[in-house]
């Protein structure tokens, strides 16, 4: 069974209500095992694949996530677009708990992550100036409006290593830099989705004010979970509306991100590397059709 739209559920969102014709699929990738089996089915008349980012039961730290396997697994299933739902802390007064942000920029503060499919004899530099698919972001913003959810379009998501939350010094530094929200996972997903030529958008659910706000307690796990439980229905409604409204065909440039990115002559790329990356680079090396 194939899918066209991928959904990544973050903290508090480990399943997607409303999906019919459900089939659970374990996918093995050249980069190892994804976080969990993918749940395939039909949502709002579209074929979707859902993945619990941290595994059901929330077993995996952000640093432990196999981001490459997660994204490659979606690619193997035929997915072309990914909606990533994530809990975030707010770095601005105007982004209140229970509200959503649809970031259009990311800033990387991670230290221990693998953020590329390339290496091992092949070099590629994809454009990442606009890390989010603009077409998807518009659809998601319209979906939040239709679902009656307060959401801001645009803003910067700073991705920290974790698993500890920020110090006040860090939180205030990020605020001084003008960042909007803080999380621990979406930067790697966005980079790898771009390399895999998949469209990607984040639906950031604000759960707290990190630790900077003088009138609010510093973030705790209990606080996050309580807000997420209240927000789960909103998140599912937004995803459902977005899936229903997503155009059938892509007219953005995400699907050709590697067209001018691969710098290594294909004749010198090791055979093992070619095989490992076949699904991603095959159409440029004349070894498969796009989307195969």
From Swiss-Prot:
GO biological process assignments: L-methionine salvage from methylthioadenosine; purine ribonucleoside salvage
Marked site (Important for substrate specificity) residue numbers: 166, 221
One family name in Pfam for this protein: PNP_UDP_1
Species per Swiss-Prot/TrEMBL record: Koribacter versatilis (strain Ellin345)
Root EC class: transferase
Protein name: S-methyl-5'-thioadenosine phosphorylase
Metabolic or biological pathway, per its Swiss-Prot or TrEMBL entry: Amino-acid biosynthesis; L-methionine biosynthesis via salvage pathway; S-methyl-5-thio-alpha-D-ribose 1-phosphate from S-methyl-5'-thioadenosine (phosphorylase route): step 1/1
Reported function: Catalyzes the reversible phosphorylation of S-methyl-5'-thioadenosine (MTA) to adenine and 5-methylthioribose-1-phosphate. Involved in the breakdown of MTA, a major by-product of polyamine biosynthesis. Responsible for the first step in the methionine salvage pathway after MTA has been generated from S-adenosylmethionine. Has broad substrate specificity with 6-aminopurine nucleosides as preferred substrates.
Binding site for substrate: 184, 208-210
Family designation: Belongs to the PNP/MTAP phosphorylase family. MTAP subfamily.
Alphabetical keyword list: Glycosyltransferase, Purine salvage, Transferase
GO CC annotations, alphabetized: cytosol
Description of how the protein assembles with itself and partners: Homohexamer. Dimer of a homotrimer.
E.C. designation(s): 2.4.2.28
Domain of life: Bacteria
Record-linked InterPro entries: MTAP (IPR010044), Nucleoside_phosphorylase_d (IPR000845), Nucleoside_phosphorylase_sf (IPR035994)
Binding-site list for phosphate: 11, 53-54, 86-87, 185
Catalyzed reactions per annotation: S-methyl-5'-thioadenosine + phosphate = 5-(methylsulfanyl)-alpha-D-ribose 1-phosphate + adenine
GO molecular function, one term: S-methyl-5-thioadenosine phosphorylase activity
């Amino acid at each position: 069974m194939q899918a066209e739209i991928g959904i990544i559920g973050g903290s508090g969102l480990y399943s997607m209500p409303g999906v019919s014709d459900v089939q659970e699929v374990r996918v093995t990738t050249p980069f190892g095992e994804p976080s969990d089996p993918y749940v395939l089915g039909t949502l709002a008349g579209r074929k979707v694949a859902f993945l619990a980012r941290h595994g059901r039961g929330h077993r995996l730290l952000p640093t432990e996530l196999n981001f490459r396997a997660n994204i490659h697994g979606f690619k193997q299933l035929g997915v072309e677009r990914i909606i990533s739902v994530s809990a975030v802390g707010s770095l601005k007064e105007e982004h209140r708990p229970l509200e959503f942000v649809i970031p259009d920029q990311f800033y990387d503060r991670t230290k221990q992550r693998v953020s590329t499919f390339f290496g091992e004899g092949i070099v590629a530099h994809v454009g990442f100036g606009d890390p989010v698919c603009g077409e998807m972001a518009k659809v998601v913003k319209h979906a939040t409006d239709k679902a009656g959810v307060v959401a801001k379009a645009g803003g910067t998501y700073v991705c920290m290593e974790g698993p500890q939350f920020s110090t006040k010094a860090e939180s205030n530094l990020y605020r001084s830099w003008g960042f909007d929200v803080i999380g621990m996972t979406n930067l790697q997903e966005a980079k790898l989705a771009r390399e895999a030529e998949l469209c990607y958008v984040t639906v950031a659910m604000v759960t707290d004010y990190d630790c900077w706000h003088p009138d609010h307690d510093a973030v705790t796990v209990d606080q996050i979970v309580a807000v997420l439980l209240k927000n789960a229905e909103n998140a599912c409604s937004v995803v459902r509306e977005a899936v229903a409204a997503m155009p059938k065909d892509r007219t953005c440039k995400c699907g050709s991100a590697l067209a001018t990115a691969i710098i290594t002559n294909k004749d010198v790329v090791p055979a093992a590397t070619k095989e490992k990356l076949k699904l991603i680079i095959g159409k440029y090396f004349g070894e498969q059709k796009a989307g195969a």
